[in-house]
Amino acid sequence: MSNESIKAEQDLIQEGVESEVSTEEASLIDELTQANFRIEELEQLLADALAKVEEQKDSVIRAAAEVDNIRRRAAMDVEKANKFALEKFANELLPVLDNMERALQGTNPQDETTKAIYEGVELTQKSLLTAVAKFGVKPIDPQGQAFNPDQHQAIGMQPSAEFPANTVMLVMQKGYELNSRLLRPAMVMVSQGGPSQEINIEA
């Protein structure tokens, strides 16, 4: 075998090996490119999944806050309903209390013929006031106090030397409140103060 034929044979082997290596390299590059695309896809899917988790976490926090608000409102509504459930019933009792007050005012406790009736009505009135006070009903009797339009209803005004201006001088009908909430204002006569005095100035 001549040197030339050996060299030609070696060149052929070298070309085959190079061709095989370049095919393997191309195949590896192709696989790496596909792997990189797949990694990018997976990273994007992971980022999307994490974003969804954050979104769901935010939704859960909002839902929990909403549930707390609903619970709080429901508890307040129940408390308010319990506190003021007696309002209608208490309003129905007010005329009874007024009639007892009138009966006491119209009866002379010193008169022997009506003394027993007076004492009976007085005891009944005290018992009823004690019973309704247990449920938060309290009378408003502003005699001698400053006029308060939030709790008093002025029937009229009169001059008075005894009471300063804008003072309740007479309670026509007591007012009542239920758990510090006004059931009925007290009907009152309000003082205008003392009669106005004319001042004579002689020059």
Curated annotation (Swiss-Prot):
Annotated region described as Disordered, given as residue ranges: 1-20
InterPro entries: GrpE (IPR000740), GrpE_coiled_coil (IPR013805), GrpE_head (IPR009012)
Biased composition (Basic and acidic residues): 1-10
A GO term, aspect molecular function: protein-folding chaperone binding
Function (record text): Participates actively in the response to hyperosmotic and heat shock by preventing the aggregation of stress-denatured proteins, in association with DnaK and GrpE. It is the nucleotide exchange factor for DnaK and may function as a thermosensor. Unfolded proteins bind initially to DnaJ; upon interaction with the DnaJ-bound protein, DnaK hydrolyzes its bound ATP, resulting in the formation of a stable complex. GrpE releases ADP from DnaK; ATP binding to DnaK triggers the release of the substrate protein, thus completing the reaction cycle.
Subunit: Homodimer.
Homology family: Belongs to the GrpE family.
Protein name: Protein GrpE
Organism encoding this protein: Shewanella sp. (strain MR-4)
